[in-house]
Amino acid sequence: MANYKRHAAALLLALAVAGGAAGCGAPSAATEAPTQDAPVSETSQPPAWTAWDPVAVTTNAAGERCFALSAQTFLQRYNTLWSADWGEDLLPALDQWTDYGVGTLSRNGGLEGRQYQTRQDPTNFAEPFLALCLTQTGDQVMEVVAGLDQKHYVQGPETLFQRKALYSLRVFFPELTEADFQTLYAQLSQDAQYAETWETPLPARVFYQDGVACYLLLQIGEYDQLHVRAADQALLDQWQAAGVEIIQGFPTADGSAAGEKGDHTT
């Protein structure tokens, strides 16, 4: 009987040791290191804008030349591009913009339509604004304008002005780089003159590609304005007849450009 008890005790001790070894030697299911690769991060996926359809230019029933692009889609695209680079959205929903109704705002040279304007701080007039001109029914974008107050033409506001304009263009041409835009902006500014207060300002030159016209308007006492506007052949002809230089295609940072001066075949 004593031998039986000794053998039973030895067996229990062996089982306890074996169980303890198993418990200490391998992590539990709750702490076990993952054996599969982590999910693929979003940054390794194609950018969202690769699935975007090109934006066409159309004319609505009221005869307004516009992009086939709603304000909501513009905001979604703009914020997608901005947040990919800066980690947050820039533009609020349209109902948080200042609504000036139908007109041309106080800006000469702009389109007549339903006017909206936004700044991150509405009381800071040194901050460059972004404006949307929509069709009078408010459902399609006609033009986008970035504006810079001439009284605050210093490095900070000017940089933000150009950056807001860049992302406006990227809504239509997502692959446009900052270096490309700097090349474009330099060429828009070259030999540009400020119109007198009583004159209707005209751009020195217009760059045009796939229905999108981009140009700079300068006038004494007004905001410096970079326009991204829906355009067609009739508008290009009108500009050219007024002496405006039309350049087909946007320049790139490597010095190339699509199209030639005066070539505005659509």
Per-range role (PLM):
Residues 33-92, 252-254, 259:
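N-terminal low-complexity, Pro/Thr/Ser-rich intrinsically disordered segments
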Residues 45-59, 121-142:
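Compositionally biased P/S/T/G-rich terminal and signal peptide-adjacent segments
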Residues 2-11:
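Bacterial N-terminal signal peptides that target proteins for export
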Residues 88-131, 178-219:
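A cross-family detector of function-defining hotspots
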Residues 167, 171-266:
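Non-cytosolic coordination micro-motifs
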Residues 25-27:
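Bacterial signal peptide processing site
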Residues 20-23:
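C-terminal motif of bacterial Sec signal peptides marking the signal peptidase cleavage site
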Residues 126-193:
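Long, charged/polar, surface-exposed segments that mediate recognition or autoinhibition
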